[in-house]
Amino acid sequence: MTTRLHAAALAVLAVFLFAGPAAAQGGPPAGEPGQHTLVFRSLEDPNVSSQPKECPFPGANLFLGATLSSIETDAGDSRVVNEAVHHIGTAAACGLITTAPLVPFYIEFALDHGHHGGITFVAVGACQVVSNNVPRAGIALAGCALRVTQGPEGFLGGIATSMSIFNPLRLQGAGTGSFWTLRAYTTEN
């Protein structure tokens, strides 16, 4: 019986080792049904309105308007090789900056191209400032974790996260913008 168990285990291992890479060449699915993941870049743009339709923070003192772009990565190491492949929409955001490192933040992503064209995702949460002196003093690095509260028909909920650079003094060498990952769950594909 032990010999049969070992033979069966070896057969399963062989199928996994040899069929796994072959099956992966077609690529794994992009997610479960009803799951939509977007990865894109935002860059502050004075030509885009910085006033979201709704801002839930009385006394908000941060307003940002940005263009949204798809990105291209190197498949071998996932390094970003093009931060602005195609314009995919715009964003308007507001926040409430105080002396605390946690900034309440609200954003409306208006997508106008691709599968999600004509759809606006709305997200709210907070951004955590982690540095205000890299790559130089006056530039803030932050990460945002936001709950996506509005989306397309059949929208159930989601999350939007960012790696963000804020350059309020408009210092040379860094623009205000973010790399975003947005995951939305819907009742439909």
Outline where the language-model segments fall.
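Short, low-complexity disordered leader/linker segments with a strong preference
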Residues: 2, 16, 26-27
